[in-house]
A protein has these predicted regions:
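Short amphipathic alpha-helices in soluble, non-transmembrane regions
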Residues: 66-74
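Active-site nucleotide-donor binding segment shared across nucleotidyl transfer reactions
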Residues: 24-67
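Short, charged/polar surface micro-motifs in flexible loops or helix N-caps
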Residues: 60-64, 106-107, 118-121
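Conserved catalytic core of two-metal-ion nucleotidyltransferases
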Residues: 77-117
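Hydrophobic N-terminal alpha-helices or hydrophobic patches in metabolic proteins across all domains
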Residues: 38, 123-124
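Acidic, metal-coordinating catalytic segment for phosphate/diphosphate chemistry
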Residues: 124-130, 136-178
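Helical scaffold of the NTase/Pol beta-like nucleotidyltransferase catalytic core
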Residues: 1-38
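Conserved small/polar residues in nucleotide/adenosyl-binding loops
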Residues: 186-188
Length: 188
């Protein structure tokens, strides 16, 4: 296992520890919701950006239940901050939560939780996308994506899907190519 794969595996293990130690999945289940892991942790492509993404489904979605879950999460002394957004009256039809959790090494992990009605337009969509990405990865494309993520400056905010499209769809292999690829999207 090379250096990048080792680092990615360690961070993915830490992310799983955050999920377990925070009790986040059981907290959401306690209010009748179904938490589903999405994003880079689900694809196995979590690198240095400490971010854990969940889509959470309820039928019906009740704002009070969402707040009850977050109140329970906030009781954990490792939770440092929580943000909330109500997007129920938008196309996204969701409640958006962001929590920051300090792990055993006092490293902050951002936990993004999108709470939406079961059966909504996005129900299962991002889970299927993540599973398709994971299914088409080769050793080479996995290593390329991890390297690009590793080489990205911490100040640069790039969505994971950008790396995946660049590498898997468009054949990008280096960070210089990735930067050019991103610039080309602006000029389309």
């Amino acid at each position: 296992m090379d250096k990048l794969s080792t680092l990615a595996a360690a961070n993915q293990q830490r992310a799983q520890e955050v999920i377990r130690d925070s009790g986040i999945e059981s907290i959401w289940r306690s209010v009748g919701a179904e938490p589903h892991l999405v994003g880079s942790l689900r694809t196995g492509l979590l690198m240095t950006h400490r971010d854990i993404d969940f889509h959470i489904y309820s039928s019906p979605l009740r704002v009070a239940d969402s707040f009850a879950a977050m109140a329970r999460l906030a009781e954990n002394s490792r939770i440092r901050r929580i943000e909330y957004g109500n997007l129920l009256d938008t196309n996204e039809e969701c409640l958006e939560w962001h929590a920051w959790y300090a792990d055993a090494d006092d490293q902050l992990w951002q936990i993004d939780m999108i709470h939406m009605p079961k059966g909504s337009a996005y129900d299962g969509y991002f889970e299927r996308v993540a599973d398709r990405i994971a299914a088409v990865l080769t050793d080479q494309t996995r290593e390329t994506i991890l390297r690009l993520k590793y080489e990205t400056p911490e100040t640069e905010k790039i969505m994971g899907i950008e790396y995946y499209q660049a590498v898997l769809r468009d054949g990008v292999r280096t960070y210089a190519e990735f930067e050019a690829w991103r610039l080309s999207l602006i000029h389309i």
